[in-house]
Amino acid sequence: MNMDFTDQRLSYEKGQLDQQSVPISPFELLKAWMHEAIEEQVQEPYAMSLATCGADDKPSVRIVLLREITDKGIVFYTNYESAKGQDIAENPNAEALFFWHKLERQIRISGSIAKIDADKSAAYFQKRPHDSQVGTWVSQPQSGEVASRDVMEQTFEQLQTDYPDGAAVPTPGFWGGYEITVSEIEFWQGRANRMHDRIVYHKEVDGSFSTKRLLP
C-alpha cells in the first residue's frame, strides 16, 4: 500500500534572513548559525549529509560529522578506502547539507574536496576515545562485507587485547581528514507561505564572495 503525504503541511515562522545584513564572509554566518544550533541544543548539529559521485556517475549520500570550520572550508574525517573515499579519488567535487529542523534552517555547501595534512589527521585520531580508535581498525575495509556481527565483535575484542586501555593505538594510514574548499554556500531560512529566504555566497576569482538572493 502506498503512503500519501500530500496533505502534510508545516508553516515555517521561526526566523528570517536579510541579504543586506549578512556578513561579508560566509564562514562568519556559518559559525554564527552553528553556534545558535548548539545553544538551542539541536541534536547532532555537526551532522551533515555528504554527497559524492564517482567515475560511474552514480551519486551517493551519507551522514558524516563536521569536525572543523576553517578559513576556506569544512573538515570531516573518514576511511580513505571507503566508498566515499573512492568517489572522492575519482571526482573531487562534493556537496554537504546541514538541516536543523528545530531552527527551520539548512545550509548547502558546494566545493572541491581533498585530503588534509597527515599529521593533522594523526593528531585528531589520537584525541578520539580509545575504543573509537580501536573501532576504526575493525572497519577495514569500510563498507566491506562481513559474515556476521559476531565476527566484528571478535575482531574488536582482539584489538582491545592488543591495545588495552591506556596503550597507544596507531593511526591507520587508510584513515584521515578531508576538507571541502567552499566555492558556493547557500543559507536557507524557512518562512511562512513557502516564501523562504535563500541567500547564496559565490566565491569569485579573486577569492572574495558575492551574495545574491534566490527565489524559494
UniProtKB/Swiss-Prot annotation:
SUPFAM superfamilies: FMN-binding split barrel. Disulfide bonds: none annotated. Pathway: Cofactor metabolism; pyridoxal 5'-phosphate salvage; pyridoxal 5'-phosphate from pyridoxamine 5'-phosphate: step 1/1; Cofactor metabolism; pyridoxal 5'-phosphate salvage; pyridoxal 5'-phosphate from pyridoxine 5'-phosphate: step 1/1. It catalyses: pyridoxamine 5'-phosphate + O2 + H2O = pyridoxal 5'-phosphate + H2O2 + NH4(+); pyridoxine 5'-phosphate + O2 = pyridoxal 5'-phosphate + H2O2. Binds 1 FMN per subunit. GO terms for biological process: pyridoxine biosynthetic process. Its EC number is 1.4.3.5. Catalyzes the oxidation of either pyridoxine 5'-phosphate (PNP) or pyridoxamine 5'-phosphate (PMP) into pyridoxal 5'-phosphate (PLP). NCBIfam families: pdxH, PRK05679.1. Belongs to the pyridoxamine 5'-phosphate oxidase family. This is Pyridoxine/pyridoxamine 5'-phosphate oxidase. It comes from Psychrobacter arcticus (strain DSM 17307 / VKM B-2377 / 273-4).
